[in-house]
Amino acid sequence: MSTVLQSFVAGRWVGQQSAQALHSAINGKEVAFAHAESLDFAEALHYGRTTGLQGMLAMDFQQRAAALRALAKYLGERKEELYAISAHTGATRIDSWVDIEGGTGTLFAYAGMAASELPSGNLIH
């Protein structure tokens, strides 16, 4: 059985029941399923504006930069897995480079700018 792709919304994973089958552009085999559950966008907005905002405000700019750097490192360590998944969309490795390496590089760049250009604390004066 293929994996059901879930959505992380309002602090929890949503999507247990399979819906649309997703097929590989390489060989036509089933690779995953989209989930059947509806997403509650009002709940997502509320969560972001309350819980998410409080979480961000609890971190200073340097901590946020470190979180971006950690995410970039995590993704970079798994780039070959991401390339393998991306191939099933019909994209070549070069096509996927912009998203995978480019996205990771952008996270590292933002982390570096935040670490070097933003002050400690969470206010800019």
Please provide the spans of the model-predicted regions.
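N-terminal Rossmann-like NAD(P)+-binding subdomain of aldehyde/semialdehyde dehydrogenases
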Residues: 1-125
